[in-house]
């Protein structure tokens, strides 16, 4: 009798282990999200630029200048892990509407402005957290929804995001002015 039970019990245990492994694999960890960010940095070919309206003269939009995209990606590689980093207190507006930069990849130039082209994931959103003199990095989950619950905080950069926005805006101004 015990031999007859051994096979079904073994099979049940194997199925449960497989299901548990699948569930664990689906839960993003800070390490897997950082890996997604690195993949996004490696494949980024454009940046959706939304300058700080008070401190920028440049129109928002898509920037495909390779050197500019490269500079942003190089800086973002300095990300610090998100341990101990929290969503900004009192955040009421959607992160999507407050992001200064969005890394884009896999787009044709005419597709860059589509509002729902989220299939090219992951997308990295960069938010200036001025109250804490830092820049927060988020990865969007790829859904068609852009509520705050659809973003995962993956890390921070330890400098004032506003300063960086202004500096990159000035670089972009000088590039477009020299062309």
Which residues does each PLM region occupy?
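Function-determining sites in protein domains
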Residues: 2-179
